[in-house]
Amino acid sequence: MEIAVIGNSDAVIGFSLAGIKKAYEATSEEELINKINEVMADPNVGILVLHQNDYNRLPKRLQSTLSNSVRPTVIAIGTEQSTEMREKIKRAIGVDLWK
């Protein structure tokens, strides 16, 4: 199972330096949506990481699809704090790691 990252050049470079091989730059909304669809179709990807700002600019229908996805589990990181990551991990592995 691999981790994929989609985002701006800074995020892609950072995750690439951390050893993530599937790190894709997407600047426009169209590039972002196309790359997300490509990664979602890849059976080797178990986790997809996006920046919260990129996630927020996606169409609501795609946001819903990503939010409900178990494989890959989609994690939006950035400035917003939420319990969503806890719920996604619980849904993906069946265990609440915070208990």
UniProtKB/Swiss-Prot annotation:
An annotated GO cellular component: plasma membrane
Signal sequence coordinates: none
Gene Ontology molecular function: ATP binding; proton-transporting ATP synthase activity, rotational mechanism; proton-transporting ATPase activity, rotational mechanism
GO BP annotation list: proton motive force-driven plasma membrane ATP synthesis
InterPro entries: ATPase_V1-cplx_f_g_su, ATPase_V1-cplx_fsu_bac/arc, ATPase_V1_fsu_sf
Keyword Cell membrane attributed: yes
Transmembrane portions of the chain: none
Gene3D superfamilies assigned to the protein according to its UniProt record, in alphabetical order: ATPase, V1 complex, subunit F (3.40.50.10580)
Membrane topology: Peripheral membrane protein
Coiled coil: none
Zinc found in the keyword field: no
Superkingdom assignment: Archaea
Subcellular localization, as worded in the UniProt entry: Cell membrane
Keywords annotated in UniProt: ATP synthesis, Cell membrane, Hydrogen ion transport, Ion transport, Membrane, Transport
Pfam family, one: ATP-synt_F
Role summary: Component of the A-type ATP synthase that produces ATP from ADP in the presence of a proton gradient across the membrane.
NCBIfam families named among the record's database cross-references: PRK02228.1 (NF002577)
Family the entry assigns: Belongs to the V-ATPase F subunit family.
Subunit structure: Has multiple subunits with at least A(3), B(3), C, D, E, F, H, I and proteolipid K(x).
Name of the protein described by the UniProt record: A-type ATP synthase subunit F
Organism: Methanothrix thermoacetophila (strain DSM 6194 / JCM 14653 / NBRC 101360 / PT) (Methanosaeta thermophila)
Organism lineage string: Archaea, Methanobacteriati, Methanobacteriota, Stenosarchaea group, Methanomicrobia
